[in-house]
């Protein structure tokens, strides 16, 4: 009997430790900002201004753009296709305050409804201690009385300072052709970031992940792999935007174009990984293997 009680106590203790290890460390910061910590990773989100991700660090090393002119920094979330709102970004989703709720180990942020598009956004942040990622699940809720179509779209800005972008796709399938000098190597497409006098954007049908290596860090984002027919009209699973000059880059991914009935919602999850990246930012089998080891965790 004593042995049975001891085993039960040990199992309960292990269960508590596992639950503790999986708990998101959420801290209230200044002026409506919240931070999440997972091991060496820290993410800072600004609920007061569009629910934007302002910072993503490994220890003290930052991977996101920290420029401070509009639409040049951090990571945001929009509806797709863009032709339905064009420019500037919808203020209810990109600029205005989100309400905040802490639900156990999940940090939830919810937007207002835009009068034209009739969608409400919700962003849920948590950590995964087992695979050392930060997990973001985005929701789009149809608050209208009509059937509507939409796709989720994450836009992550990094500095253009000699980095390397790569993902699995044939380089000659990236469109429009010849806007960026993607090259095939090790069964992936690679682009050593450059600068030009004009803005450039390309599209690709990838395999559910997108990577960026620079300044000793490797950022990998994992999301649902789409069939070629699934993105919104004129859009793509993976997009890369280079702002003119040597300013910033947008690493973009999109989910499936979905029909939503009134009050129906879609959800789409992106896992963020950030690890040290030794050596030069150049194509290599070792770098591809490192990225895919994160994707396949």
What are the language-model segments listed below?
Residues 1-4:
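Positively charged n-region of N-terminal signal peptides that target proteins for export
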Residues 7-16:
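Bacterial N-terminal signal peptides
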Residues 19-21:
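Boundary at the C-terminal end of the N-terminal hydrophobic targeting segment
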Residues 23-28, 37, 81-131, 147-150, ...:
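Extended, loop-rich substrate-binding clefts of extracytoplasmic carbohydrate-active enzymes
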Residues 33-94:
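Acidic-aromatic substrate-binding/catalytic surfaces of carbohydrate-active enzymes
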Residues 34, 41-43, 51-54, 62, ...:
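A contiguous, surface-exposed recognition patch within enzymatic or periplasmic domains that forms
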Residues 100, 259-276:
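Short Pro-Gly-centered flexible turn/kink motifs
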Residues 273-297:
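Terminal connector regions
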